[in-house]
Amino acid sequence: MALPRPSEAVPQDKVCYPPESSPQNLAAYYTPFPSYGHYRNSLATVEEDFQPFRQLEAAASAAPAMPPFPFRMAPPLLSPGLGLQREPLYDLPWYSKLPPWYPIPHVPREVPPFLSSSHEYAGASSEDLGHQIIGGDNESGPCCGPDTLIPPPPADASLLPEGLRTSQLLPCSPSKQSEDGPKPSNQEGKSPARFQFTEEDLHFVLYGVTPSLEHPASLHHAISGLLVPPDSSGSDSLPQTLDKDSLQLPEGLCLMQTVFGEVPHFGVFCSSFIAKGVRFGPFQGKVVNASEVKTYGDNSVMWEIFEDGHLSHFIDGKGGTGNWMSYVNCARFPKEQNLVAVQCQGHIFYESCKEIHQNQELLVWYGDCYEKFLDIPVSLQVTEPGKQPSGPSEESAEGYRCERCGKVFTYKYYRDKHLKYTPCVDKGDRKFPCSLCKRSFEKRDRLRIHILHVHEKHRPHKCSTCGKCFSQSSSLNKHMRVHSGDRPYQCVYCTKRFTASSILRTHIRQHSGEKPFKCKYCGKSFASHAAHDSHVRRSHKEDDGCSCSICGKIFSDQETFYSHMKFHEDY
């Protein structure tokens, strides 16, 4: 097919621009590029056809220097790796007329006031914008051809807000920038053109939103705390247990140090846009059996794994056993949550429940469908007005009730312990009951150990310092902390430390005011079992009806009395 000469008019599709699609109402305004068949035909002509271009070059050289274009900013463009958001711009009639390689502008949900009120930006032509920002054959950089999209601005420290500029950034891959910083592309020593950007403009260029006091949700900051600036020594102040190689941070995520109160910790932040529905994982860590979990231990980075609706085991990401997912902090309330914990085939995954923008922290919590399944306390659930909160039916106004015997416990921990070691849950699997008390066991050897240690007072483990004996080696190890001074259990409310978790548990009740042990005679409550028993022995000795009619001994509780009576029955 013969190509027309440059002087001939080339038929093109007529483009109709609606009156509401003016540059003042759109964040990005471009006119379609003409067909490049003219330029291909011009290059095939003789030398005389270039005379008009040489005259134009001479006129441009004689003209005075053109000052920098007085625009404030250019609208950001989507990079090829990001998903396109459907905006009202794409519904315009002229959008379908654009060539397939045309760079698609990103239109924010609302146009900032500084764009709609700027006459310089509204009057700028598309060719000027393309020459100043997009490129072209000039000194500012290489030209971006039709088959390439404009890359997003680099996450350089000089472009970040002041709060994030002083933070400690751990990228997932080594930086490709030179240590000396960016160098001007002009080889003649001329400084490149500089533009004055306000903080409002900078947020719009980098994130596509404008921070304002009316919309605090659009601000990007460390939600779980304040960003910690690096120390004067220049070190990154990383803990000894943090192994950068084992973190395996995905592309687009980074690790920053934040502080909440006076306690510094780490958080995972987003360095590039993350769409809704992206899944990370699985969560890695040490497999811990349910019987090995300490009730008042550090279980902050531990997830429950369920099989057939029952708790199977835990995955503990504490220390160096976990990957980067163990540094994702929990959300304080549902509105700041952007990740949902999902269990799939015995593994825990984090899935984004909303769009996560650059420099936002990743915050995880359970999904709505997992609250009841994973036994989250009712106080953490959000109940809509007019609806009753969903909670465990076994919890009454008094506490947690045993369905077999009717006993009520103040805490679920004690009710579960009661169900574990009493015949109330005997479904045929506990075939070995103790003849001296009411406890029953699944295996014969467990019953033998129980009788040996509890009833016969067998204490084979002796302390070499004080001579005290214990039935189990673990009890001896806990006792040795008294002599060595080791106190590994610290109170979270004060600075006191203790040798055993049971002592810490009793101490914490002084701060919380909890008194789970209630006297059945007078109704007085106590924080520890020892204080309760001491009160019964001192105040209700005469009122206690649990007295042995054979030897005259008096017992404070019925279980001890029944165990004592077994000895008289056997003899």
Swiss-Prot record:
Pfam families: PRDM2_PR, zf-C2H2
Residues in SET domain copies: 251-367
EC number: 2.1.1.-
Bias (Polar residues) ranges: 165-176
Post-translational modification Phosphoserine, affected residues: 79
Subunit structure: Interacts with CBFA2T2.
Homology family: Belongs to the class V-like SAM-binding methyltransferase superfamily.
Name of the protein described by the UniProt record: PR domain zinc finger protein 14
Species name: Homo sapiens (Human)
Gene that produces this protein: PRDM14
